[in-house]
Amino acid sequence: MEMLKDFDISPFKKMKPPVDSGYTTRTEINELKKIPLNKSFVKKFDNIESAFAKTAKDNNIKDYDKSIAAKLIKESAPVILKLKKYHDRPRPKDLNKNLPNYEMASMKTPSYPSGHSVQGFLIGAYLSDKYPRSRKALMATAKNISYSRRVARAHYKSDSKMGEKLGNSMYKHIKNKK
């Protein structure tokens, strides 16, 4: 299944991140400093597949297929990595060495866009279409996955917002192919 094989990333190459030394980036770093570092919240939403599986269980989605999230993560990863390498934005911890963060294995790639935000919103939208009665809970999980990356200080707000846009665009692409 290659749902994103022909996904056009060119519009997302044009959506540049804020300049590293600019006002917006400094403002975003200051915003990160104000967010309490909550490791249990970060851990709860770091594993995207587990977060959606828990939401499905909590909302009694009987026919939930956990392989859907795994497939969407696998399919979206190469697209996300291309954009991360293209934009090559440093992580907040790289621009502000005094910024405490919750170091995770997933923080090895450039910052923009947030891959967790992309995948959270892609999966949230896909599952919401499949399970419309649980849409509110599924999209809340997507939002928490995205926000957890800022709580960990792994991403700037603009990384998360770009990730959310990209995830929604990927979902629309997949839906239009059906």
What name fits each language-model region?
Residues 144-175:
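Interfacial helix-loop-helix junctions of multi-pass membrane proteins
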